């Protein structure tokens, strides 16, 4: 009996010990859960505060950001031959060949090239002057032998303005061609109107040309795709375009302004639609403007001229498209020159 009693006492002690150990484990488990919950809450609070701090540039984000830059060296930008301004416009290219700007005569074409991506360096084919310094890219009161991409516009791919310059020389219409590009990919007409962020850049470009002794002979406008996508009305487009024309006139540009029929840019990858509707508000506005006087003339109808094979991504102009568009501009400018000469 005594042995049995001792055995029961030992079992009871063991059970008690296990129960105590379990209680301690439960307590530890509860403590751990509390720690996790508190930690998660703290992390969420820090995330929220950090987001507000970063968004509004208030304490402690600027201080932490500065500390990170001191402790961890920022990755240096990869070397490039290109230089861009704060609006991503190409303003430098180490491959350019600087030359003396041609003296302007009555056989010099000075083309101010305005618009969005299909007037900028987004073409599918690069071109260069076939006539050396007779076709130049004017930028910042300097001239360079014309070659894609042109200084003064966004992006670094191809363009067809240099090809147009070659055609103007080859046709005998001009002895020299000065290309003055100012085109911004994706730009709406509102950005070019008075109060828009591109209007002062336009004014500065005109002043640079004038300071170089150059008088613009034609303004070529290729834009409209962005406004179709965002739903700009025909009335609003006309008002904003005329505001830009007023800026040109107020700063001494008396040359004709050619407004292209340009509204087609397909596929969501380009910010466009799946299908194009030719009769749209932007085209109606462009047609009305070209017939409304004020020195505004109808430019190339790229919507109708170019087919699917001429746009390498259903929006931007490829090699065959560049040939078509440059020849169409040649015909327009040559025809108007003959008309003016006959008067």
Can you name each region flagged by the protein language model?
Residues 27-45:
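N-terminal Sec-pathway targeting helices
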Residues 4-8, 16-31:
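Short, Lys/Arg-enriched N-terminal segments with co-localized hydrophobic residues
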Residues 39, 46-343:
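Cell-envelope and extracellular/periplasmic
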Residues 8-12, 36:
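N-terminal compositionally biased, intrinsically disordered segments and leader/signal-like regions
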């Amino acid at each position: 009996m005594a042995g049995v009693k001792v055995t029961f006492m030992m079992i009871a002690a063991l059970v008690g010990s296990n129960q105590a150990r379990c209680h301690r484990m439960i307590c530890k488990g509860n403590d751990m859960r509390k720690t996790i919950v508190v930690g998660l809450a703290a992390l969420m609070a820090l995330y929220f505060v950090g987001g507000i701090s970063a968004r509004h540039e208030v304490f402690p984000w600027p201080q932490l950001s500065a500390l990170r830059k001191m402790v961890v060296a920022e990755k240096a930008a990869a070397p490039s031959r290109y230089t861009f301004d704060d609006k991503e416009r190409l303003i430098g290219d180490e491959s350019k060949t600087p030359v003396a700007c041609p003296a302007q005569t009555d056989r010099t074409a000075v083309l101010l090239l305005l618009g969005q991506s299909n007037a900028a360096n987004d073409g599918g084919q690069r071109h260069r002057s076939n006539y050396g310094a007779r076709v130049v890219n004017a930028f910042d009161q300097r001239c360079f032998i014309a070659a894609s991409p042109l200084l003064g516009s966004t992006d670094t791919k191809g363009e067809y303005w240099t090809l147009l310059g070659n055609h103007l020389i080859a046709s005998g219409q001009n002895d020299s061609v000065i290309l003055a590009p100012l085109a911004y990919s994706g730009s709406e007409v509102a950005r070019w109107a008075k109060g828009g962020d591109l209007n002062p850049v336009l004014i500065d470009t005109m002043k640079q040309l004038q300071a170089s002794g150059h008088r613009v002979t034609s303004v070529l406008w290729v834009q409209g795709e962005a406004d179709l996508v965002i739903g700009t009305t025909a009335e609003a487009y006309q008002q904003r375009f005329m505001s830009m024309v007023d800026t040109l006139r107020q700063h001494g540009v008396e040359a004709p302004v050619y407004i292209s029929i340009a509204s087609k840019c397909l596929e969501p990858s380009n910010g466009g639609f799946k299908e194009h509707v030719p009769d749209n508000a932007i085209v109606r506005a462009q047609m009305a403007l070209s017939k409304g006087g004020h020195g505004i003339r109808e430019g190339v109808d790229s919507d109708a001229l170019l087919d699917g094979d001429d746009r390498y991504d259903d929006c931007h102009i490829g090699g065959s498209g560049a040939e078509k568009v440059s020849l169409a501009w040649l015909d327009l400018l040559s025809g108007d020159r003959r008309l003016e000469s006959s008067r």
